[in-house]
Amino acid sequence: MSRSDLDGLGYRGKVVVITGGASGMGEAAARLLGELGAVVHIADIAEPTVACASFTRVDLADPASVTSATVGLAKIGPIDFLFPIAGVPPHAVGALTCMLINYVGTRQFTESLLPQVRDGGTVCLITSTAARGWLHHLAENLAIVALDPLAVGAFYEANPDKLRDGYSTSKELLTVWIHQAAIALAEKRRIRLNGIAPCATGTPFMEESAKVLGQAFMDAYPHPLLGRMPSGEEQAWSLLLLSCPLNAAVTGAVLATDEGNVGGMITGALTAAYVQAR
């Protein structure tokens, strides 16, 4: 099937801004969007290899860099789809920087560009199966989501025990923010805000994780039903299908794209020795 046969997904000619388009799921999403006829603007710390309408360098851990990038991107005109999906594992940058990139910078980037998103537009983020404890920590997560995002780093510097590994915490906060912020965006501007929550996926992210976690961890990782890690492109399709206008009734949702991992863990249908209470 050619990409032109998929025009019904509604991306042809639409303006898209995406972070993380230089690698992994972000690269796959940016490439697919281009093939679907979208006008793709990529923001990342590394220059992408995928074709795009423009590239803006941004360090999501640096608020000044985020401000500079979003001021520039605001000039491209109304945005139809916003995909702030860059993310890093904690062992690559440390727990605090992981938090700054995955939650603080991502939320700052998103909120800075929301005025440029068309009424009726769509925003979609990437959380993780690592956020499965978000309800268990709901009161704490709500309190932190209520903070100015730029104050969150200082909060965790003063309370390092609450940071945990930085990754699961950042993804829990994104999950809570999606559920909460979607309400006002829908009521006031008919903007849909959703997320996907992938399991371990065959991307450079997991290649780096394997170096730290070890092959035994990777061999023991449960891959129910499919028997393998999904690819970055498979996760990107979930992101794009959830965000397309055919799913106009869906907002405030976090779609589990995890081969049944979290549901299996919650119900006891799936057990894994490495899973610890969070």
Regions found by a protein language model. Name each.
Residues 108, 166-167, 172-175, 195, ...:
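C-terminal helical subdomain
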Residues 197-208:
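Short, flexible catalytic-loop segment of classical short-chain dehydrogenase/reductase
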